[in-house]
């Protein structure tokens, strides 16, 4: 959620092509994946802690959430949404056919139409009509959203995404119908780099979890 782009976005200088690396890592990734006959999936963080117009002070997750020096008086969230939508358009336009687009994530008041989610999902579906999208324009890993509630929104996505658990009996909606899901499980105890976290799950456990997901 730090806002650093691994692709060559024209809307920011905070990107891999503007470092000593000097490479569009997303372009290299999709090329390598397709060369092996695999499907292409991209992750996109709805949160951007680097962007000046994303809420800082008082936000539940922002690193500066408790620092009064980062109050939100001059921030323009609509300007941030324009920036974010433009970047989604870039990844849906510049990297060929996408098979999965994984948004992350919604919480508190930042969910659904706070992201202009209907407009965003319509743009994605227009540019990538066959893409599969997760449910995190409306929820996080803590819930399953309108897809499970039996009253799906226009931006509900195609599957739900529980975190750090594999549902033993799958997931059903309120009517008892099975719904598609993807389990998000870390290999250690953190989602990003953590120098002190050496508690990696052993290979047999990871293999077992993969088998459980597809069995």
Model regions and ranges:
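Mature catalytic domains of secreted/periplasmic carbohydrate-active enzymes
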Residues: 1-215
